[in-house]
Amino acid sequence: MIDAGYFAKRVQPRPDCLPASGVLEICSVSECLSPGADDWIASWRHNGLGWFNRVSDAVGVIPEKRRDEYRLFAYRIHPEVFRGRERSALPLPDDVHPEPLPAGFRSIGFDSASRSSVGGLSLECSPLSCNAMASEMPVNEHCLFPTLDAAIAGAVRFAAEQPEPGDYYVVEVLEGGPRIEPSLSANAERAST
């Protein structure tokens, strides 16, 4: 797995339309159900995967008064892309070089997400949450695959069946705490100036 960046999201509870009773919340890499900060892209601090190389940048795009609504995630990406029935080496964008993972992050699962354009900004959809496939596959309470092997099997299936168009990427999702604390926000602001 390759360290790929950081992103803060407003994690949403499982919607009623997702019939996966063991799922409590949506922590997928997709922004479809659990979005990032409004207009985060306008800051243009992200890398070629649509994540941030620095924790301070991931936190810095969130308005100060709303930071308690967000949770901070780190992502590690599998070195292969799943396309149709084939696998190929991941073409990692040159600007993906995140700072070392700070202490306190823990793995909460794995996702398999689509990207329909090689030049696209970020990963787009997670069939587990976006297409309710969490009701058909083994997932944890975060709507993520519990193991890397399960996520790879999911990517193989999704790439072949195309519940969402595009190539599929496997990502480990790590969380740095239940919420972005004011002290982290203040430190992030100082670090980004």
Q: Where do the language-model regions lie?
A:
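Short, mixed-charge low-complexity intrinsically disordered segments
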Residues: 43-95, 140-144, 148-193
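Short aromatic-glycine-(Arg/Gly/Cys) micro-motifs in beta-strand/loop hairpins
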Residues: 1-49, 66, 75, 94-141, ...
